[in-house]
Structure formats: structure tokens, C-alpha cells
């Protein structure tokens, strides 16, 4: 019933698109009759009309799409089909176009990119890896340039490349920019650490199209991009608390929900902790670090498994990517969790680096004035797209009907029986010369099957998501006659598999998947490797009760039935009851996995709200300071007065000696206290006196920064230094706070409420600290000049 309703709604959306498609098609003959010069002149005409506000992008769409459509035929030899135009209309509207593999998403994206770039603001195409960004840029660049727009790759595609001064500005100073989500995210964070307006390089984030949009803003939505700073002071609690955690009993001292990745102390567990560490209440503010490390140690012990989430290599904890199965050397969990795992495994603790800046992909793309996306599997994530981003998903019809045969799952009790059956099936298909693509969840499984096939004299290509460019070429050849390719689920994504000569008659590409993935969208993506553009094809998933998804997400007793695993697999295969039960178990496990992931993303989104609002305000203030060309109207007296008033109310400043010490610490290293006692009798008089000392010291520094340019740079540097130091402290504190409270959702406190409450309190304290640090920087900094007579500021 739900599918029927969804199909009806999609049909209604397609009908609305048809009206605009007709308008585009109506202009086809007109554009076809244009000379090259006349067609190229359209871009300048469109820009002028938009600039004069004679039209809008929506009104211009039919004409602009018809223009680039005709240009594409002349420059690239490709004329976008009607279904591609429909997908392009959906994306200009800011929604998600679901387009199947091989339907030409790369060409489709050129239309909304061209239209939105006509405003004079940059339009971005964002994809998942460097290879795809570079490939699509190189293919489409001639089209944009022929039409008079500039296009660039937003990075230099050389490993460990060091950018020259102003090189980033040149890369981003284009109408259309191709880049990746990771590179754009880090560029955004670094751009907002610039200490001079000329050092900033990102253009206005106006419009973006995200390729593989579900992978980037759903699956990776809660993955934070982090710029790490100086090492934190290492806590000596990890080893002590590791021993404490080992004394705790599940259900009595702590509760555990593996599916939701939650673990928290019970009331009795809190009492045990109070007694163990000899404190009245571990949740008092002074014991924040104690609670933080207890929670980290509980998570390390019960939610992270050796050889599944990480393994020990050369005395170090090396993380494993659960999706690809690849190890991630050099990558570390944040906020002390990595150190908690190291303590658990008894290896040397690595440095826990502080966090300088962070943002999630979810918040990154919300910075754009508008963004849209394209994917082959958007419909399955439609609810979440709408709930999180207010995006509709429109399923675009394929240009040719899909005739791929998606067979029922083959089910087994044991994994070794399943693996044996998979190898036999590959041999059987290979004997006919039909190409086979065997897809696994992990690199380890892919290597196993590849090795076994070689032992059986079946040559094969192994792709385990290591060399993207090389693997893209290999996956493209997977449709050739007699080809056998073994691949992880992530390898070669974004590359079409075209059928070689004689393969169509054999039934197209055969896709065998060795287990269901944790997300049904990924299953569908993998099946979609076969049967592109109306080609024949076949796909089948093999499952067993030993599969990861069953062990991780199912609580079915059937999965633990040891007697079942002794039954002849052929008999089980012939049992409709067994097949139905196993499919039901796998289906439910996948549903639990998807719901849990969705809840985790919702939770991450809630946690991200506070830091997102704070980050926007801090970066807005940074930009205001960078863009200020004259500080003569800046009210430093009020700033100083706020700080002095706060400090006199909250610090122990009661007598002459306290005031003198305060002046030495905050205002002047050369203060002379001759007449201090006669001038200050009340708090207001003390504040007035401190403001007087502030102005006196500031004037001394102005004698050194003795022209308008030096004064401007000094004020900017002093204020930005204060903002950056305190904001870095705030970000790091919020990261640690999140790790500390994240476990308490089912405990005595509401984790989100507590997090936002403390985040607001620490933000308000940060504002005072920024003001104080600004005053201190203005007064106590030492100003010198380098050999080029440029001002150098040595901060206190």
C-alpha cells in the first residue's frame, strides 16, 4: 500500500516536470538553427538579463537548458535525453533526482550547474572522491568553456601537494567548481582560520549538486571533519578506570544496548563509582574528567570489538572501516575514545589531540543557499531527506526499461557452506564466458574469494577500494566476455560497467553478492551494477546465519541453533520454511540496522545544533573583524569595562595588592602603583581606574604601530588571536562534553538537554574570555618589525 501511494505521488511530480520539459523541447529547433557564435552569445545575454532583473532563474530555465543541451551535442557529441532534462529540473528545484546507474548523471548535472552559474556566483559539483571529481571535471570542462563560463577542479590532484600563496583563491575563483565533500569541508574550516582578508579563498556557498547524495549527507552525515591542534594534557585516569570498569557487572552496575551503541551507569553503578573513587558525587563539576573517562572506558570495552572495529598492529590500535573492511592507519577516534581502547588493550597510549575546528557534512551543506543531489537509491531514504533537509526525492524514469533479473536470496545455515556455493556458482557461470562480478562486504572476504578462484585456475581482478583510479578502469572492464571481478562494496563506485561484445547474448553481467549489507540502499546499489541502460543482467544475494548483519543486529534464536547447522545444506535449501525464516531474520536485522543508523544521525544532528549556531556566530564575527578597515569607531572602552566589571564581581580582587596583581597580569608589565590607593575607594572607581590604565598602555603600543595600516593589522591580529584561542578551547570542550554525556540518554539525565545547557553556559563564558583576551593582547603584546619592516606581534 505504501509503495502504491509513493508511486502515485511520484507520478504527480513527474507530470509537473513534463510541463517544463515541453517548454525546453519547444526551443530545441530554435537552438539547433543557431550558429556557434549565436549559441555561445546566449550566456552573456542570460547574465545581462539576470543582472538587470529582467528575468529569474526559474523563468530562464527552459532557454538555458535548451542552450546547454544543444551546446553539449556540438562540443561533447552527447545530447541530453528527456529523462536527463527532467532530472536536471528536479535538481535546480533543490530536490533529489533518483537516476539509475548508466542514465548519465554527469551530463545531467551540467544543466543546473550552468543555469545557477549565470548569477555570477559559483556553482559546485561535489562527489565522493578525487578521481570522480577530476574525471567529471575533465569531461565537462570543454562544454562550460565553449559557453563562456570558467570551470576548475577545486584542488590539485597530487598527493601531499603544498599550495602556494593565493593558489587556492585561483582554484576557487571560477563559475563552476568540481570537488569532493571532504576537501570542501576542510577548506571551509581552514578558510575560517585565516588571519587576513586576503588569505581567505572560499567564494559564497551559493549552489551545489551532490553526487551520491545519500552516501554523503545520510551515511556520512554524522562523521565530523576535524582539524586537530596541540596535544591535550594526557589524563592519568585511563588505566585506573580500566580496572574499575572490569569490576562492574552488566544490568547491575551498567546497562548496555549494543544495537543503539549505548552504555551507561545505573544508580547502583554510580554509587559503586562514588565509593571506588572516594567522592560524594561523580557528577559534580569538579569530577567532569572522571565521568568522561568512565564513559569512554565503558564504550571502549563493550561497544568496540577487536578484529571488527580495530586490530592491534605493531603495538598500535589501527581502526577498521566497517563498510569496506579496510584498515585506516593514521585515523584516530576523537575525544579520548582512542586512548580508552588503547588502555583496554594494554598498549602505549597515543597523544590525545585537541580539536581546533570541526563540522559535520550535514551542517556543511546547510551553509549553501541551495543544494540538491543525485543518486541511484534516493527513494529508500526519502523520509530522512525530507526530515533533515526538506528535500523531496523524485524517481526519474529510465530511458530504457530495466530488464535485470534480481533473483531470490540463496540461504544457508553456515558461512562456509555459503562460500562454497558461491565459488561453485562463479565457476558455473564462468564456464559459459558470461562475466561475473562477485561483491563482498569486506576486503578480507574479497581476498579470500580471489585466492580460492585462482586456486581453481580462474583468473580474476581484485578490487578492494585502495587505488580509486586503477580500480575504476578495472571495474569498467568487468563486463567483458569471460571477465571475473571480485570487489568490495565500495570499490569502483561511480563507474559504469559496459557490456563487451557477445555478452548481451549470454544474459549480461552476473552480480553475486556474498551477504546483505547493513543498509538496503547499498544492496540496491550493488544490484544496479548490472542491467544498465536496458541491458540484460542478473543479480543474487547469498546469505547465512553466520553473516555479520545477523550476528550484529538480530536476536533470533534460529541464528544460534547449533543443530540446524548440522543439517544437509541441500535439504535446507529445499525447505520453503527455512528459506522464509532466514530471509525474515535478515530483513528484520537490516531494518533494525537502518533504524538505528537513522536514530544515530538524528541524535548527531541534535548534538550538532549548539556547536553549529556557535560556529556560525564566531565565524561571522571573525569575518566582520577581517573586513573592518578602520577601528577608530570601535568602542574598546566598553569592552574593557565589561571585562573589569565581570572580574571584580567574580574574582578575589579586594584590596590594593589584588588590583596591582590584576594590572600586571592583564594590562601592563611596567605599571607604577604610586597613587593607586587615593584614586579607588569603590568598585566603580576601580573600574574607571582600570580603564584609564588600559588606555594608557594601548597608547604606548599605538606609538609603535604608528600608521593606519599597522594599527589596523595590530587590532585585527589582537582580536582574531583572542577569538581563535577561546573558540578552539570551546570546540574542544564541547567535543569532550559530548563524549561524556552521550551515554546518559537512558540514564538519569537527558543527554541532549544537558549538552545544550552546558554548551550555552560555556559559550557565554567564552564571550567573556574573548573580551578579556582581547584586552590582554592589546596591552601586553610586544610589537616589533621584521627585516622587511612588516609589523610582528608577539602575544603574551
UniProtKB/Swiss-Prot annotation:
Q: Which GO terms describe its molecular function?
A: ATP binding; protein-exporting ATPase activity
Question: Does the record bear Translocase in its keywords?
Answer: yes
Q: Which PROSITE patterns match?
A: SECA_MOTOR_DEAD
How does it sit in the bilayer? Peripheral membrane protein
EC top class, in one word?
Answer: translocase
Q: What is the catalytic activity of this protein?
A: ATP + H2O + cellular proteinSide 1 = ADP + phosphate + cellular proteinSide 2
Q: Where does ATP bind?
A: 84, 102-106, 496
> Which family does the record assign?
Belongs to the SecA family.
Q: Which NCBIfam families match?
A: PRK09200.1, secA2
Q: What is this protein called?
A: Protein translocase subunit SecA 2
* Organism of derivation: Staphylococcus haemolyticus (strain JCSC1435)
Amino acid at each position: 500500500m505504501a509503495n502504491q501511494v509513493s508511486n502515485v505521488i511520484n507520478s504527480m511530480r513527474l507530470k509537473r516536470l513534463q510541463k517544463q520539459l515541453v517548454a525546453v523541447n519547444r526551443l530545441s529547433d530554435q537552438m539547433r538553427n543557431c550558429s556557434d557564435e549565436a549559441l555561445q552569445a546566449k550566456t552573456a545575454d542570460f547574465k545581462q538579463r539576470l543582472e538587470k532583473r529582467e528575468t529569474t532563474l526559474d523563468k530562464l530555465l527552459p532557454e538555458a537548458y535548451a542552450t546547454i543541451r544543444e551546446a553539449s551535442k556540438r562540443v561533447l557529441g552527447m545530447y541530453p535525453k528527456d529523462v536527463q532534462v527532467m532530472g536536471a529540473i528536479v535538481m535546480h528545484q533543490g530536490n533529489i533526482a533518483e537516476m539509475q546507474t548508466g542514465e548519465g548523471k554527469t551530463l545531467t548535472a551540467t544543466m543546473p550547474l550552468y543555469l545557477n552559474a549565470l548569477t555570477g556566483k559559483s556553482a559546485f559539483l561535489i562527489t565522493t572522491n578525487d578521481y570522480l571529481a577530476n574525471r567529471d571535471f575533465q569531461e565537462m570542462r570543454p562544454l562550460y568553456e565553449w559557453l563562456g563560463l570558467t570551470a576548475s577542479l577545486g584542488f590539485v590532484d597530487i598527493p601531499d601537494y603544498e599550495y602556494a600563496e593565493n593558489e587556492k583563491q585561483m582554484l576557487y575563483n571560477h563559475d563552476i567548481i568540481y570537488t569532493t565533500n571532504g576537501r570542501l569541508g576542510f577548506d571551509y574550516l581552514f578558510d575560517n582560520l585565516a588571519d587576513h582578508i586576503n588569505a581567505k579563498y572560499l567564494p559564497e556557498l551559493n549552489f551545489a549538486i551532490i553526487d551520491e547524495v545519500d552516501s554523503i549527507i545520510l551515511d556520512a552525515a554524522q562523521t565530523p571533519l576535524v582539524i586537530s591542534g596541540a596535544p591535550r594534557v594526557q589524563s592519568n585516569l585511563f588505566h585506573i578506570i580500566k580496572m574499575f570498569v572490569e569490576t562492574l557487572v552488566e544490568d547491575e552496575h551498567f546497562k548496555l544496548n549494543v544495537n543503539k551503541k549505548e552504555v551507561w551507569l545505573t544508580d547502583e553503578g554510580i554509587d559503586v563509582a562514588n565509593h571506588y573513587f572516594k567522592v560524594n558525587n561523580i557528577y559534580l563539576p569538579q569530577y567532569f574528567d572522571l565521568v568522561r573517562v568512565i564513559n569512554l572506558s565503558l564504550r571502549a570495552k563493550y561497544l568496540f570489538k577487536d578484529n571488527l572495529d580495530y586490530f592491534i598492529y605493531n603495538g598500535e590500535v589501527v581502526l577498521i572501516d566497517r563498510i569496506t573492511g579496510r584498515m585506516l592507519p593514521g585515523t584516530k577516534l576523537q575525544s579520548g575514545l582512542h586512548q580508552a581502547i588503547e588502555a583496554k588493550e594494554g598498549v602505549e597510549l597515543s597523544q590525545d589531540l585537541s580539536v581546533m575546528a570541526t563540522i559535520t557534512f550535514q551542517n556543511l551543506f546547510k551553509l549553501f543557499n541551495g543544494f540538491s543531489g543525485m543518486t541511484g537509491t534516493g527513494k529508500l531514504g526519502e523520509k530522512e531527506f525530507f526530515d533533515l533537509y526538506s528535500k523531496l526525492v523524485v524517481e526519474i524514469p529510465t530511458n530504457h526499461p530495466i530488464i535485470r533479473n534480481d533473483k531470490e536470496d540463496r540461504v544457508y545455515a553456515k558461512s562456509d557452506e555459503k562460500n562454497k556455493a558461491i565459488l561453485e556458482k562463479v565457476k558455473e557461470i564462468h564456464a559459459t564466458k558470461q562475466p561475473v562480478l562477485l561483491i563482498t562486504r569486506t576486503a578480507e572476504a574479497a581476498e579470500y574469494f580471489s585466492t580460492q578462484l585462482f586456486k581453481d585456475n580462474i583468473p580474476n581482478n581484485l578490487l578492494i577500494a585502495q587505488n580509486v583510479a586503477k580500480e575504476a578502469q578495472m571495474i569498467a572492464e568487468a563486463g567483458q566476455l569471460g571477465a571475473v571481478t571480485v570487489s568490495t562494496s565500495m570499490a569502483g563506485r561511480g563507474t559504469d560497467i559496459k557490456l563487451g561484445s557477445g555478452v548481451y547474448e549470454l544474459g549480461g553481467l552476473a552480480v553475486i553478492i556474498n551477504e546483505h549489507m547493513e543498509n538496503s540502499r547499498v544492496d540496491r546499489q550493488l544490484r544496479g551494477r548490472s542491467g544498465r541502460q536496458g541491458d540484460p543482467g542478473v543479480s543474487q544475494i547469498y546469505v547465512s546465519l553466520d553473516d555479520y548483519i545477523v550476528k550484529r543486529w538480530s536476536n533470533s534464536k534460529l541464528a544460534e541453533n547449533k543443530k540446524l547447522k548440522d543439517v544437509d545444506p541441500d535439504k535446507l535449501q529445499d525447505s520453503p520454511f527455512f528459506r522464509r525464516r532466514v530471509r525474515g531474520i535478515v530483513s528484520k536485522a537490516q531494518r533494525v540496522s537502518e533504524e538505528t543508523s537513522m536514530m544515530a544521525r538524528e541524535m548527531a544532528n541534535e548534538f550538532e545544533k549548539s556547536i553549529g549556531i556557535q560556529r556560525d556566530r564566531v565565524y561571522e564575527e571573525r569575518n566582520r573583524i577581517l573586513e573592518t578597515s578602520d577601528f577608530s569607531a570601535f568602542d574598546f572602552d566598553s569592552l574593557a569595562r565589561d571585562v573589569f566589571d565581570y572580574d571584580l564581581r567574580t574574582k578575589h580582587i579586594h584590596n590594593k595588592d589584588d588590583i596591582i596583581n590584576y594590572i600586571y597580569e592583564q594590562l601592563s608589565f611596567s605599571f607604577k602603583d604610586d597613587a593607586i590607593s587615593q584614586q579607588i575607594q569603590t568598585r566603580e572607581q576601580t573600574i574607571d581606574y582600570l580603564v584609564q590604565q588600559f588606555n594608557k598602555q594601548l597608547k604606548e603600543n599605538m606609538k609603535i604601530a604608528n600608521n593606519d595600516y599597522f594599527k589596523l593589522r595590530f587590532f585585527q591580529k589582537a582580536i582574531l588571536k583572542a577569538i581563535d584561542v577561546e573558540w578552539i578551547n570551546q570546540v574542544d570542550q564541547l567535543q569532550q562534553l559530548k563524549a561524556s554525556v552521550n551515554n546518559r540518554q537512558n540514564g538519569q539525565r537527558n543527554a541532549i538537554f544537558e549538552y545544550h545547557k552546558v554548551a550555552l553556559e560555556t559559550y557565554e563564558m567564552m564571550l567573556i574570555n574573548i573580551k578579556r583576551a582581547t584586552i590582554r593582547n592589546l596591552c601586553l603584546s610586544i610589537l616589533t618589525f621584521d627585516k622587511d619592516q612588516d609589523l610582528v606581534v608577539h602575544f603574551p
